[in-house]
Amino acid sequence: MANLNDSAVTNGTLHNPKTQQGKRQSTGCVKNGISKEAQQNRKAYAEDKPVFEPYQEAPLYVYVLTYMGYGIGILFGYLRDFMRNWGIEKCNAAVEREEQKDFVPLYQDFENFYKRNLYMRIRDSWSHTVCSAPEPYMNVMEKVTDDYNWTFRHTGKVIENIINMASYNYLGLAGKYDDSMVRVKDTLEKYGVGVASTRNEMGTLDIHKELEDLMAEFLNVEAVMSFGMGFATNAMNIPVFVGKGCLILSDEFNHTSVILGSRLSGAVIRPFKHNNAENLEKLLREAIIRGQPGTGRAWKKILIVVEGVYSMEGSIVNLAQIVALKKKYKAYLYIDEAHSIGCTGPTGRGVRELFGLDPEDIDVYMGTFTKSFSGSGGYIGGKKEIVDYLRMQSHSTTYATSMSPVVAAQLIRSLKITMGYEGNIGGMERIQQLKENIKYFRRRLKEMGFIIYGNDFSPVIPVLLYMPAKVSAFSRFLLKKKISVVVVGFPATSLPEGRARFSMSSAHTREMLDTVLEVVDELGDLLNVKYFPLKKSGRAILYNKEGFDNEASFEEMHSEPEA
């Protein structure tokens, strides 16, 4: 343990008094975080009290009606396919050529059928064209269709001042140019927009190194490697860590980028039930006892892959128990903090900080710069030898163009604001405001009678709508009321669990939230999607009290805020 007398507390984390540039800070400094006295007086927990992340189920009739709706849609879909085959109705869908009928099908049968006959009916709920910065208010171009959603055209009109509940602007750092972006402008003048090379050739700039050093300080790890694309950070780098003869234990709700990267690795993949430590331990025990299929040899590596905040569920990984299992069975842990870094934990350092765990408990930190930090790209952090190996072996460093220096400058700006080094409104104020917005919005939705998934610390708030017709109606109605929200359905979710997903931001004012809640309340009555009273399922997520960084975090997890 570092000596507090020789170190400074910066943004709630113990750091050496020497900064990145080698300059000393005063040993008593407090930057946007927790004082040394608070660190010294932090209470240890004597009890092991469980905390539940409630999972609520709709009444049975809702599932019955949802499947009936799909059944009717499928029947009409077959009827329309019959009419298309006989030329009665024009077919706008992509089809196989007759001479290639004996080839491997280009489209999976049901997914192609679903897209052609069901998704196409509600396709107007997605892919809107935004023509402004993703600020709390934004502008969207109006679109119409002349062929039942097969194609769209813009009318030339712009829908202005839409309340933005769809963008991942968690800390409110995305926006038009202001005085804090002077360095971004200077970087553009000095470096230009593009790098025109890969990281392993001529594409590593000093500003990339500065960004990576700052991110390593923020994460409290030895080294960080940055990448130009968040999706590729998972897809192209998981194969670097595991390959044939290795086992990946992946949460069933992990992101598509994790799934793709796992498949590309050649490792054996076994999903475990969402956030279920008991099921994960069962798979770990079986893997160690039985070994590799066919030969029974021991696995070269066992890699557990989880997310910090699950973007479709709004749930937070049960990290304390996952880490305990990782240590018990000598596995490795890879965590994707795309939706948790910057906005979760007392100082925004993610779920590791929220649970009060040691930074070395996690082997590979992955995250994106697109959410809290309002840029683009991703990063992987950890021990220096891991990151150095990644620099040499990753397809993203060998073949992909480096991150734009302008984006790197924006990310440095965002990180410094989050860490309290710059900005009129520091990271702690933004994180606290985001936390208050999340708790207020979730509480009000629950009081109205909606089914809400996820955790009270999650900036993602899913509202369950179930029926696909209600999913599209929800989106269309809100857009008419100048509110934007993401709606999600199959295959991004299970077939019956269509939902709306509200993304919270510290930039949302209470007046904005009240406006949205008033409209959503009216819409909930209109669509009959207030399913209270509800029956709680046994699928609860269990947390240990000792896993939290401080008592306030634990108490807030399972206490209702005051009105």
Swiss-Prot record:
Component of the serine palmitoyltransferase multisubunit enzyme (SPT) that catalyzes the initial and rate-limiting step in sphingolipid biosynthesis by condensing L-serine and activated acyl-CoA (most commonly palmitoyl-CoA) to form long-chain bases. The SPT complex is composed of SPTLC1, SPTLC2 or SPTLC3 and SPTSSA or SPTSSB. Within this complex, the heterodimer consisting of SPTLC1 and SPTLC2/SPTLC3 forms the catalytic core. The composition of the serine palmitoyltransferase (SPT) complex determines the substrate preference. GO terms for biological process: sphingoid biosynthetic process; sphingosine biosynthetic process. It catalyses: L-serine + hexadecanoyl-CoA + H(+) = 3-oxosphinganine + CO2 + CoA; dodecanoyl-CoA + L-serine + H(+) = 3-oxotetradecasphinganine + CO2 + CoA; tetradecanoyl-CoA + L-serine + H(+) = 3-oxohexadecasphinganine + CO2 + CoA; octadecanoyl-CoA + L-serine + H(+) = 3-oxoeicosasphinganine + CO2 + CoA. GO terms for cellular component: endoplasmic reticulum membrane; serine palmitoyltransferase complex. Residues 1-32 are annotated as: Disordered. Residues 1-29 have a biased composition (Polar residues). The keyword 4Fe-4S does not apply. Its EC number is 2.3.1.50. It is found in: Endoplasmic reticulum membrane. It is an enzyme of class 2 (transferase). One of its GO terms (molecular function) is serine C-palmitoyltransferase activity. Component of the serine palmitoyltransferase (SPT) complex, which is composed of SPTLC1, SPTLC2 or SPTLC3 and SPTSSA or SPTSSB. The heterodimer consisting of SPTLC1 and SPTLC2/SPTLC3 forms the catalytic core of the enzyme, while SPTSSA or SPTSSB subunits determine substrate specificity. SPT also interacts with ORMDL proteins, especially ORMDL3, which negatively regulate SPT activity in the presence of ceramides. This is Serine palmitoyltransferase 3. InterPro entries: Aminotrans_II_pyridoxalP_BS (IPR001917), Aminotransferase_I/II_large (IPR004839), AON_synthase_class-II (IPR050087), PyrdxlP-dep_Trfase (IPR015424), PyrdxlP-dep_Trfase_major (IPR015421), PyrdxlP-dep_Trfase_small (IPR015422). The modification N6-(pyridoxal phosphate)lysine is found at residue 371. The lineage of its organism: Eukaryota, Metazoa, Chordata, Craniata, Vertebrata.
